[in-house]
Amino acid sequence: MMSDLRLNQLYAGSNHIHIHGHRGARGVMPENTLEGFRYTFGIGIQFIELDILMTADGVPVITHNPRLMPYSTRRNGQWLEIEGPLIAETSFDELSQYDVGGLKPASDYGKRYPDQAFQFGQTVPRLVDLCHLV
């Protein structure tokens, strides 16, 4: 009962809605990219949701999945055929060789967000890069 009371207090008097940018601007711009976050802030959204993982060399990076995913990752202009390396086992320099600026159109994820912008050359950003952007 006590926890219900505290939860209700959070809603008391609130007459506005806070809009959050999920992974930046997922579905509009490539998720978890600096361009996606820049877009989100540019349209006036002040709250963002993101995930942070550590690379093998200890760099905090912004990415949702523990691996690079074939539906959103290209290397040397080609989509990955299978899941890529684990973020935790990849150095930041190695991770930066992958392009995460689009969705593979034929994938389920690509079909789910067919209007998402394709931004060539987007890499998994470091947390510090987002902090500088903010």
Model-based region annotation:
Residues 1-134:
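Phosphate-group recognition and catalysis centered on beta-loop-alpha active-site segments
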